[in-house]
Swiss-Prot record:
Protein's organism: Chlorobium luteolum (strain DSM 273 / BCRC 81028 / 2530)
Family: Belongs to the class-II pyridoxal-phosphate-dependent aminotransferase family. Histidinol-phosphate aminotransferase subfamily.
Subunit structure: Homodimer.
Highest taxon listed in the record's lineage: Bacteria
Swiss-Prot/TrEMBL cofactor(s): pyridoxal 5'-phosphate
Protein name from the UniProt record: Histidinol-phosphate aminotransferase
PROSITE patterns assigned: AA_TRANSFER_CLASS_2
Length: 357
């Protein structure tokens, strides 16, 4: 009898699919993955590689990347015992979810949010409590808290500023949710450098159940290096890191991080450029017929059009990649485009104008 391999696999695999970037990852104007348009300057790459070639390549790195942890802790002004470094923030999502979830445990996820949250929760066979955003794509903090208490959830994950909506929760709302729900609250601040709201990082000093997640892939322009961090009270961090994969961060990532943090003015300049372009782009999009732009606290903008598939395909035909997010709840007709260089942004505006004629 032929063996059915599916009966040996996690049944949750039947509910999820492989991660796919629609349209691919290569285009003359690539605005679909919320990356920085600025690469690390060559002089800094050369300084990084000069140090890296002196490292032993035949030896494992430290079990945990202590040099990277200490550098980022010093940058934030927090004790190193509160910080963990991962191979991208996605690795830390898996780690934290494994520490908090399992069959019968409950996670609250505002909807829409980063798709990986639901995927990992399903793999962990957890029960998902979905809380919709408001019609304007803003968070409904009152409803989040109401459902968290009613469902006695174990973990709340808040992407703020949110991907894909671009909207934020205030630190006061996060404090209220964490205090009154009693659940562990994971605050994913992947886009915090672009936000009009301050970081929720000070809440780690105040509350025992708040975890902050950071990525170096957006503002720091290190998507290719895979560097992420979590910050939490030391007692909580000691538990969250138990499932962590050892040796997951390589020596090059640690060295790169230290050099970029030591030259942080480069990051500030690029963020300033992106924020200026974001405001200029939003203003121009507001004046265009046939679309509705949404205000954003991130390095991307959401626009709503009548036929997102047709507009997506038209732009792709012009060599411009954006993200079709119209399949997300409450985001019917929406496309997501990250802020690029000025010339790239101009090509996007011109392409949209032609697509909407």
């Amino acid at each position: 009898m032929q063996n059915d391999i599916h009966r040996h696999l996690n049944p949750a695999l039947q509910k999820i699919g492989a991660y796919v970037v629609e349209g691919g990852q290569e285009a003359p104007v690539k605005l679909n993955q919320n990356e920085s348009p600025f690469d690390v300057p060559m002089w800094l790459k050369e300084a990084i590689t000069r140090e890296f070639v002196r490292e032993p390549w035949n030896r494992y790195p430290d079990i945990l990347p202590y040099r990277g942890i200490e550098a980022y802790a010093e940058f934030l002004g927090v004790p190193a015992g509160r910080v963990i470094m991962g191979n991208g923030s996605n690795e830390l999502l898996y780690t934290i979810f494994m520490a908090c979830l399992g069959p019968g445990r409950r996670i609250l996820i505002p909807e829409p949010s980063f798709s990986l949250y639901e995927k990992i929760a399903l793999l962990m066979q957890a029960d998902i409590v979905s809380v919709p955003m408001r019609r304007g794509l803003d968070f409904d903090a009152d409803l989040i808290l109401e459902r968290a208490k009613a469902e006695a959830v174990d973990l709340i994950v808040l992407s703020t500023p949110n991907n894909p909506t671009g909207k934020s929760l205030s630190p006061d709302d996060i404090r209220r949710i964490a205090t009154e729900s009693g659940a562990i609250v994971l605050v994913d601040e992947a886009y915090i450098e672009f936000s009009r709201h301050p970081s929720a990082l000070p809440l780690v000093d105040e509350l025992p159940n708040v975890v902050i997640l950071r990525t170096m892939s957006k503002a720091l322009a290190l998507a290719g290096m895979r560097i992420g961090f979590a910050i939490a009270p030391e007692a909580l961090m000691a538990e969250l890191t138990k499932p962590k994969i050892p040796f997951a961060s390589n020596r090059l990532a640690e060295i790169t991080l230290r050099h970029v943090l030591a030259n942080y003015s480069i990051v500030k300049d690029s963020v300033s450029y992106i924020l200026d372009e974001r405001e200029r782009m939003y203003s121009e999009l507001e004046g265009m017929d046939g679309l509705q732009p949404f205000m954003s606290d991130t390095n991307f903008l959401i626009i709503r059009v009548a036929d997102p598939r047709a507009v997506f395909q038209h732009l792709r035909g012009e060599g411009i990649l954006v993200r079709n997010v119209s399949g997300y709840p409450l985001m019917e007709g929406c496309l997501r485009c990250n802020i690029g260089l000025r010339d790239e942004n101009r090509r996007l505006l011109d392409g949209l104008s032609r697509a909407l004629r």
